[in-house]
Curated annotation (Swiss-Prot):
Pfam families: Folate_rec. The keyword Cell membrane applies. The gene is Izumo1r. It is found in: Cell membrane. Coiled coil: none annotated. Residues 1-19 form the signal peptide. Receptor for IZUMO1 present at the cell surface of oocytes (oolemma), which is essential for species-specific gamete recognition and fertilization. The IZUMO1:IZUMO1R/JUNO interaction is a necessary adhesion event between sperm and egg that is required for fertilization but is not sufficient for cell fusion. The ligand-receptor interaction probably does not act as a membrane 'fusogen'. Does not bind folate. It comes from Mus musculus. This is Sperm-egg fusion protein Juno. Changing residue 97 to A: Does not affect ability to promote sperm-egg interaction. Its main location: membrane. One of its GO terms (biological process) is sperm-egg recognition. Was named 'Juno' after the Roman goddess of fertility and marriage.
Length: 244
C-alpha cells in the first residue's frame, strides 16, 4: 500500500506538468501548419518574431504578405486597397495565426468530436492589439463583418455578395472588440487585459525580444487542466483508501 501512495504523490507532482506540456509549444492540425514547431530561418517580414520556434514555413510566411493571400483564396482588396497600416495589422494577425506555437489552450477540432483538421477559438488578444488594429483600419472599406463565411463564390474566389455594399470598417465594427471577435468568426477574443499582464496574447512583438506569449499560454494551459485534474487524482486517491 505504501508503494501505491508513493506513486500517487508522484502523480500529483508530475501529471499537471505532463498534461500541460500537451498544450504548450504545439501546432494545430491543418493543411498549412507544420506537424510540430521548430526554428525557421528567414521568415518573411511580419512573421519574423517566430523564427526561433514557428509552426509556419518560410513559404507560408511569404504567402501571408501577398495582396491576395494564397492561404485563404481571398483578396483583402475586395473593397479596394486597405490603408498600409491596416494591411500591416492583418498580415501580423495572419502570421500570428499561422506561426505561433503558443495557441495550444485554444485549439479545437473544426468539426465537433472530430479528430482531423483543427482551428483556434477565443484566443485572448490584448486590449492594445485590438485597439491599434481597429484604429488603423477605421477608414478602410469592407462589405462584411465576418470574413470567414457568407461570400459570393460564383467566380471561384471570394467576392462581396450583391446585397452587401462596401462600407467603412467603422460601420461593420463599431468598437475594437467587434473587429477582434467578428472578423474571423471568434478566432480571437478581445481581452480586457493589457500587454505584459501575463493574461493576454500579443499578435505581434519585436523580433529582437523574447516571445511574451509563452508565459500566457502556460497560465491558460494550467487553468484549462485544473478541472480535469481536480476529478481524476482525487478519484484515484479514494480508490487507494478503500483498496484492501
Amino acid at each position: 500500500m505504501a508503494q501505491w501512495w508513493q506513486i500517487l504523490l508522484g502523480l500529483w507532482a508530475v501529471l499537471p506538468t505532463l498534461a500541460g506540456d500537451k498544450l504548450l509549444s504545439v501546432c494545430m492540425n491543418s493543411k498549412r501548419h507544420k506537424q510540430e514547431p521548430g526554428p525557421e530561418d528567414e521568415l518573411y517580414q511580419e512573421c519574423r518574431p517566430w523564427e526561433d520556434n514557428a509552426c509556419c514555413t518560410r513559404s507560408t510566411s511569404w504567402e501571408a504578405h501577398l495582396e491576395e493571400p494564397l492561404l485563404f483564396n481571398f483578396s483583402m482588396m475586395h473593397c479596394g486597397l486597405l490603408t498600409p497600416a491596416c494591411r500591416k495589422h492583418f498580415i501580423q494577425a495572419i502570421c500570428f495565426h499561422e506561426c505561433s506555437p503558443n495557441l495550444g489552450p485554444w485549439i479545437q477540432p473544426v468539426v465537433p468530436n472530430g479528430q482531423e483538421e483543427q482551428r483556434v477559438w477565443g484566443v485572448p488578444l490584448c486590449q492594445e492589439d485590438c485597439e491599434d488594429w481597429w484604429r488603423a483600419c477605421h477608414s478602410s472599406l469592407t462589405c462584411k463583418s465576418n470574413w470567414l463565411h457568407g461570400w459570393d463564390w460564383s467566380e471561384e474566389k471570394k467576392h462581396c455578395p450583391a446585397h452587401e455594399p462596401c462600407l467603412p470598417f467603422s460601420y461593420h465594427f463599431p468598437t475594437p472588440d467587434d473587429l477582434c471577435e467578428k472578423i474571423w468568426n471568434n478566432t480571437f477574443k478581445a481581452s480586457p487585459e493589457r500587454r505584459n499582464s501575463g493574461r493576454c496574447l500579443q499578435k505581434w512583438f519585436e523580433p529582437t525580444l523574447s516571445n511574451p506569449n509563452v508565459e500566457v499560454a502556460l497560465h491558460f494551459a494550467g487553468s484549462a487542466l485544473a478541472p480535469q485534474l481536480s476529478y481524476t487524482l482525487p478519484a484515484f486517491s479514494l480508490c487507494l483508501l478503500f483498496h484492501p
